[in-house]
Amino acid sequence: IEDNGLFRLYYRGSANNPLGNDRHTQDNPMTVCYAESRDGVNWTRPNLGLVEFRGSKDNNILWMGQEALAFAPFLDTNPAAPASERFKATAATVIPGRKQYALVGFVSPDGKRWTKIGDHSIIPDDTTNVFDSQNVSFWDPTRNKYVTFYRAQKSGTRWTKFAESADFAHWPKESIQWFDYLGAPLEQLYTCAARPYPRAPHIYVGFPNRYQPHRTSPQQPGPDMNKGINDAVFMSSRDGVHWDRRFLESFLRPGRDPLNWTDRNNYVAAGLLQTGPDEISVYFNQNYRSPTAHLRRGVLRLDGMVSVSAGYRGGEFVTKPFTFTGDTLSLNFETSAAGSIRLELQDQHGNPISGYELETFPPLWGDHIDHVVTWTANPRWGTSLKKLEGTPIRLRVVLRDADLYSLQFRQAEPAKP
């Protein structure tokens, strides 16, 4: 979680579990632990002094007990949220008299001292609810509501449900919908790690874990361990229900470490952090159930989850008609030394707009995160596209040995005096 220049990390802790699995004892309870960082790279574990563990409060534990199983916090950006509830969280727990897990809510003024908001499930009961892994929630300013993605089971397959609510403590049953993967192959996907992408918050990006239950690695440590191996994939959505999985390949592979080829590894943490002007950090677990269990940081270029890519022989695409707000167009791209990107603006019927034809656009080459483009036929307009603002257009993009990661129409920054 990014909070005014401070990065906060929450993780489930365990201490020298002799069983080597998820069985917790009185001497080895489930805990929620806390770390923080100013750069997302170097992390400290502050002494919180909140929870007694083995006779001492000198630790970074902020919660102990069943709720630590799937404790998932977020910074509440709802402008109406009181200061005492600046942070919120969900967690799976067992409520007396219930056979299945319930999803309960928590609030906190500082992200460290947490209060449970009752022993009721904030999600209506349903026999398909599971909740036993990370359930992601957040305030969505584009909807003006809270959104949650939580684990469920559909015909024996791990699945995820969507719900939305104006009240974090109560989620209406009529808002609940199953994820729709739009015809993608049926796979065991859960812990979706999905949140709005910070640079385009109207788009959700997710990194669900993909579980292969019938594959067992030789490194699988003992008969008490769960079978299966895991990796992570990428998906995106504009409404939180319909998810685009056109990229079916693994986003995060287990790699060469044999201890990453056991179950419950390669889970991506919810929340991408921008840790530099041109990079995003993504965090994931490795060596689960092993004494060397740890979190690892991976780095992507800004907007670098996927790209439109063309080889040396080249390729092109044309968008659907759209309108834009702003007066400049910026590209995030890279090419080879021999590669290039060229653009053309067309009217909604596919006809080139005078002055914005492909032949008037100088080929772009290089590696840029934020490159404002111009057409040579329009020197008097410079980079301005103001005359086309609000008009339906198409964008034609021609690539050769190049990758286009993102494009953005925006208002040009005022000239410095």
Predicted regions: what is each one?
Residues I1-P417:
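Carbohydrate-active catalytic/glycan-binding domains of CAZyme proteins
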